[in-house]
Swiss-Prot record:
UniProt function note: Forms an icosahedral capsid with a T=7 symmetry and a 40 nm diameter. The capsid is composed of 72 pentamers linked to each other by disulfide bonds and associated with VP2 or VP3 proteins. Interacts with terminal alpha(2,3)-linked sialic acids on the cell surface to provide virion attachment to target cell. Once attached, the virion is internalized by caveolin-mediated endocytosis and traffics to the endoplasmic reticulum. Inside the endoplasmic reticulum, the protein folding machinery isomerizes VP1 interpentamer disulfide bonds, thereby triggering initial uncoating.
Compartments, record wording: Virion; Host nucleus
GO cellular component, as recorded: host cell nucleus; T=7 icosahedral viral capsid
Leader sequence residues: none
Family per record: Belongs to the polyomaviruses coat protein VP1 family.
Protein name: Major capsid protein VP1
Source organism of the structure: Murine polyomavirus (strain A2) (MPyV)
Keyword Cell membrane set for record: no
Keywords linked to the UniProt accession: Capsid protein, Caveolin-mediated endocytosis of virus by host, Disulfide bond, Host nucleus, Host-virus interaction, Late protein, Phosphoprotein, T=7 icosahedral capsid protein, Viral attachment to host cell, Viral penetration into host cytoplasm, Virion, Virus endocytosis by host, Virus entry into host cell
GO BP annotation list: caveolin-mediated endocytosis of virus by host cell; virion attachment to host cell
Domain remark in the UniProt entry: A DNA-binding domain overlapping a bipartite nuclear localization signal is present in the N-terminal region of the protein and is required for efficient virus formation. The intrinsically disordered C-terminal arm interacts with neighboring pentamers. The unstructured nature of this region allows to make different interactions depending on the structural context: pentamers present at the 12 icosahedral fivefold axes bind five pentamers, whereas pentamers present at the 60 icosahedral six-fold axes interact with six pentamers.
UniProt GO molecular function: structural molecule activity
Motif (Bipartite nuclear localization signal): 4-18
Gene3D superfamilies reported for this sequence: Capsid protein VP1,Polyomavirus
Length: 383
């Protein structure tokens, strides 16, 4: 009998005793800034860049331009004087304010009734403070150096420095917080906490008061010492900043055209430009200089340059036709101001809603209603 050939199966082979683990599924839809984010748009026109700059708003407006009638202070605040009481009213031209602007883009969607729309998404930004070399000017009519009475160089710009820049698809959300709530700011020319809340500031405004919030919707109107970026909001905006304090702190500033700041979040999605617009804002304070006669100090601000890269992205249409038609009809009606029919002071006594039909009840005095849980309740009349 011929010998049998051995099986070709190796005895060392081990079978998998259990199924191999599979990668956990991840969500494909992402809601960002109130939008359901979908895929990226590909093609030659799907990426664009925009360059812009913002000038500082230190208190002195751009006009008048005459260098003898106030124009010489453009880029500076006017003279800051020490308060004479706890209820000091600072002048508006001594308050550095936020710089902001909106850059508009061409319309991407001709048909707003589609299920999906295209939006610009901010991907990255290159930004730089311009003009730091001007701080080398030490021959101006400023405070003299402490080691030279009326000879040699003057004291350069020094003191507290504050740098913040932001970019996104919506105006920057701000949180109000002040050092002393007893300070009385002027009600015209600037936006204060009282402008928003319609009330005087309280002790909570020296910490975090949830009602003292605003949106940066005006250039040169929101004082830096009052309004700060709100970390609880700004979901569709990115902001970056740093602060260096001190009365004689030397200005420290780095600048380069090779540094890129990525605006994407942990999910790879950047700020979505709603309404075909990109909002930019910044504050760049380099310190202050003291005048020759020691009368006052002037804070110095610098402009900032932006170069933003944007790409197109598909999002689910957040504006259904029903809401568009409803808003159209509502806007056609005249706007009236009548007595309150909703809210705390409502004058509505009773509302009845009927659904379907039922037999006539035997006792018309029985009260029937639907509670907040959707259950039908019957209250029997008392004796």
């Amino acid at each position: 009998m011929a010998p049998k050939r051995k099986s070709g199966v190796s005895k060392c082979e081990t079978k998998c005793t259990k199924a191999c683990p599979r990668p956990a599924p991840v969500p494909k839809l992402l809601i960002k800034g109130g939008m359901e984010v979908l895929d990226l748009v590909t093609g030659p026109d799907s990426v664009t860049e925009i360059e812009a700059f913002l000038n500082p708003r230190m208190g002195q407006p751009p006009t008048p331009e005459s260098l003898t009638e106030g124009g010489q202070y453009y880029g500076w605040s006017r003279g800051i004087n020490l308060a004479t009481s706890d209820t000091w009213i600072p002048r508006n031209n001594t308050l550095p304010t936020w710089s902001m602007a909106k850059s508009s883009f061409p319309c991407l969607n001709e048909d707003l009734t589609c299920d999906t729309l295209q939006m610009w998404e901010a991907v990255s930004v290159k930004t730089e403070v311009v003009g730091s070399g001007s701080l080398l000017d030490v021959h101006g009519f400023n405070k003299t150096h402490r080691f030279s009475k009326h000879k040699g160089n003057s004291t350069p710009v020094e003191g507290s420095q504050y740098h913040v820049f932001a970019g996104g698809g919506e105006p920057l959300d701000l949180q109000g917080l002040v050092t002393d709530a007893r300070t009385k700011y002027k009600e015209e020319g600037v936006v204060t906490i009282k402008t928003i809340t319609k009330k005087d500031m309280v002790n909570k405004d020296q910490v975090l008061n949830p009602i003292s919030k605003a949106k940066l919707d005006k250039d040169g109107m929101y004082p830096v010492e009052i309004w700060h970026p709100d970390p609880a909001k700004n979901e569709n905006t990115r902001y970056f900043g740093n602060y260096t304090g001190g009365t004689t702190a030397p200005p420290v500033l780095q600048f380069t055209n090779t540094l890129t700041t990525v605006l994407l979040d942990e999910n790879g999605v950047g700020p979505l430009c709603k309404g075909e617009g990109l909002y930019l804002s910044c504050v760049d304070i380099m310190g202050w200089r003291v005048t020759r006669n020691y009368v006052s100090s002037l804070e110095k601000g610098f402009p900032r340059y932006f170069k933003i890269t944007l790409r197109k992205r598909w999002v689910k249409n957040p504006y259904p036709m029903a809401s568009l038609i409803s808003s159209l009809f509502n806007n056609m009606l005249p706007q009236v101001q009548g007595q309150p029919m909703e809210g705390e002071n409502t004058q509505v006594e009773e509302v009845r809603v009927y659904d379907g039909t039922e037999p006539v009840p035997g006792d018309p005095d029985m009260t029937r209603y639907v509670d907040r849980f959707g259950k039908t309740k019957t209250v029997f009349p008392g004796n």
